[in-house]
Amino acid sequence: MKTVLAQGKTAARIALADAITPHSVGIGALAGLEGELTILDGVIHAARVTPNYALTSTKLTGSQTDDSATLLAICEVAEWETVLLGEVSSLSALETIVAAELIDRGFDMTRPVPFKVETTFSEISIHVLNNSCPIANPDGPEPWRGNFNTKNGHLVGLYAVGFGGELTHHGSDSHIHAIVLDGDVVNSSGHAESFALEPGSILYLPK
């Protein structure tokens, strides 16, 4: 992440068609920081900001896309186990829950672990990069930002302690993207900045 976001080295590094399988889950950024990538069960959600500052979010499999990523963190998970959640008040609260569940299951906490959540968001704020990173280029185009209330959706994340600047932002133990639905249709996707989850959300951890 440091190389891409802070140093501005945003060239294409990997073709998504070569990387994504039906069991892939992960997060990333499009080449040139043209947008955000969220991969859920082999489906690529690519969010981009249009010239008039609207958001488009496409939903494709690896074989259907010719997009490339400058930043991509994916894992292959064939089987998941589930945990029913109560109310989750914040992103940091979810981090605490995920950490406790991973420790309870004997995961190696020195290695990144993927997770996903099926949920109803009480509220959520996301952003999508707009051909620039405000860290490396504060005078560049502003990211698209969206706020939503009472929407169904998904979270896809990596829990990664000690990977600040590599897989997570400094000061965070996770890197989480969101897919926000409008009914059964994807409304938006992007990097999750903050959220609260209603009771009954389902946390998925690798089995």
Predicted segments with their positions:
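N-terminal low-complexity or amphipathic/hydrophobic leaders
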Residues: 8-70
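Short, hydrophobic/π-rich interface segment
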Residues: 131-182
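C-terminal structured interaction module
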Residues: 179-207
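Contiguous hydrophobic, core-forming segments of folded domains
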Residues: 48-109
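N-terminal nucleophile
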Residues: 57, 159, 187
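Mid-length scaffold segments of soluble, non-membrane domains
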Residues: 87-144
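Extracellular/luminal recognition modules and glycoprotein regions
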Residues: 2-22, 76-80, 91, 150-162
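Extracellular structured ligand-interaction cores
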Residues: 34, 112, 173-175
